[in-house]
Amino acid sequence: MCGILAVLGCSDDSQAKRVRVLELSRRLKHRGPDWSGIHHHGDCYLAHQRLAIVDPASGDQPLFNEDKRIAVTVNGEIYNHEELRALLPNHKFRTGSDCDVIAHLYEEYGENFVEMLDGMFSFVLLDSRDNTFIAARDAFGITSLYIGWGLDGSVWISSELKGLHDECENFEVFPPGHVYSSKTEGFRRWYNPPWFSEAIPSTPYDPLVLRGAFEQAVIKRLMTDVPFGVLLSGGLDSSLVAAVTARHLAGTKAAKRWGSQLHSFCVGLEGSPDLKAGKEVADYLGTVHHEFLFTVQDGIDAIEDVIYHIETYDVTTIRASTPMFLMSRKIKSLGVKMVISGEGSDEIFGGYLYFHKAPNKEEFHRETCRKIKALHQYDCLRANKATSAWGLEARVPFLDKEFVNLAMSIDPEAKMIKPDQGRIEKWILRKAFDDEERPYLPKHILYRQKEQFSDGVGYSWIDGLKAHAEQHVTDKMMLNAGHIFPHNTPTTKEGYYYRMIFERFFPQNSAKLTVPGGPSVACSTATAVAWDASWSKNLDPSGRAATGVHDLAYENHVPIGNLKSKKMDSVSLGNAVGPQELTIRS
């Protein structure tokens, strides 16, 4: 992932302003440590921090059209860039970068070209011919993006809050699947799939079609000129990503450059479910497997850095981001710059355990629609920022546009969870890859119960976080929570603890509004809480809160009051710039 910052229509075009823009852009340097660039035209600045993945030698940004009157700063990967180049025979490209097509497509097709892009992206394009600009974000918000407005009438656009939060009077999340145009001074939705209306689809389920679509989604994401690997927790989603990657890697350009031996990575507490399952899958697939161990105290020591980088106070996201944040640093230290990950599957197929209680296929489908629309606030945010904190890029094939549109066109009756018929969560995805002749995975892995990432790294991780918060947030503080935090008032001590840290980094009112709120159980939306009356008594985002569903649900688990937060001797992470020494097993 790269980092982009644009300041458009500012009243000050002095050298001091340029220096300030560069200073703010450097706050995003963790996202793109390989190169930095800036383009200044009149009252507009485009800045870029580059993570070089495709064409590392010549793809520096900002990028331009032939006469340099159209400039663009991009964070993303355009997987169909070669096909798009073929549509532009009269254009000359300066680089081999996949993002180089954007300025030329705009010159040829105007603002509507965004629909032609297949990939993950956020960009700002400046047309100096008429001093206008557009900005756009990918369909699901895989890449992070924010927009703000200054008192001088300027528009600010940044990959992260930290690039603009103390320069703008007001700022907000740039909505996924939208284009912002200076000509209209407003947003237009460019991604309008049939499922977005939440109408109930009726296409029959075809396992081979679904399998083929996912394999193509993975193959697209093997476009790289740098070393890469896969994140492998041993759960269904990451295991399928690893299995398909391993099966199709040989013969690709990436394999010719870096070899066909796939590397896989897993993180967890000693003895965690993910470490055990991840190693088993890695052994089955023959990957070079790397395990990263952390302790509860390691994670607690990193919480402040995690909140600074992830830019949220959402409990679920912070729980899951912390081990991913720790793992990403170690992956990058091994020389890897890109990983393929399994985010998005649970939202598309109703994989969260609370979907067991969906009353009918209509409610099931509408909830999946709501979950996909909110991905940019949760799992996409985590996957993007936890990896980008260390200059690592995460690609997510389950959020391929074509794959999502296909999967969301299937009659949701096929997705319904029916234990009496042997259909557990994500049954249609499991069935699609249940190949007796050429198995992708062992049966017990293919049908392993869903674990949320924050649960799978080790159940004591969440319990340890709660115990730590108990020591730092008093009952009196909780009584006054509604007065201190009137918006999205924290309902638990853990939530209060995260909120205090967040507001120390991002004190503006606009910042707190960028984070979603509302009741949730096991990652549900507020609407789905009504599916089971008992859930309102235990609004915890852990999958174990889905009582009566998870094998290790909270009703069978040790209560938090019996746990103590304990200082571990093995590791101290310190702050973000200090060394972290996690145990590595390869």
UniProtKB/Swiss-Prot annotation:
Instruction: Give the molecular function GO annotations.
Output: asparagine synthase (glutamine-hydrolyzing) activity; ATP binding
Q: In which pathway does it act?
A: Amino-acid biosynthesis; L-asparagine biosynthesis; L-asparagine from L-aspartate (L-Gln route): step 1/1
Q: Which GO terms describe its biological process?
A: L-asparagine biosynthetic process
Where does the signal sequence lie? none
Q: Which residues carry out catalysis?
A: 2 (for gatase activity)
Task: State the UniProt keywords alphabetically.
Answer: Amino-acid biosynthesis, Asparagine biosynthesis, ATP-binding, Glutamine amidotransferase, Ligase, Nucleotide-binding
Kindly list the positions annotated as binding L-glutamine. Answer: 50-54, 75-77, 98
EC number assigned by the record: 6.3.5.4
Q: Can the keyword Ligase be found in this entry's annotation?
A: yes
User: Which principal EC class is assigned to this enzyme?
Assistant: ligase
Q: List, alphabetically, the Gene3D superfamilies matched.
A: Glutamine Phosphoribosylpyrophosphate, subunit 1, domain 1, HUPs
Report which residue ranges the record marks as coiled coil: none
Q: Which residues form the Asparagine synthetase domain?
A: 193-516
Q: Does the keyword Membrane apply?
A: no
Which annotated residues bind ATP? 231, 267, 341-342
What protein name does the entry list?
Answer: Asparagine synthetase [glutamine-hydrolyzing]
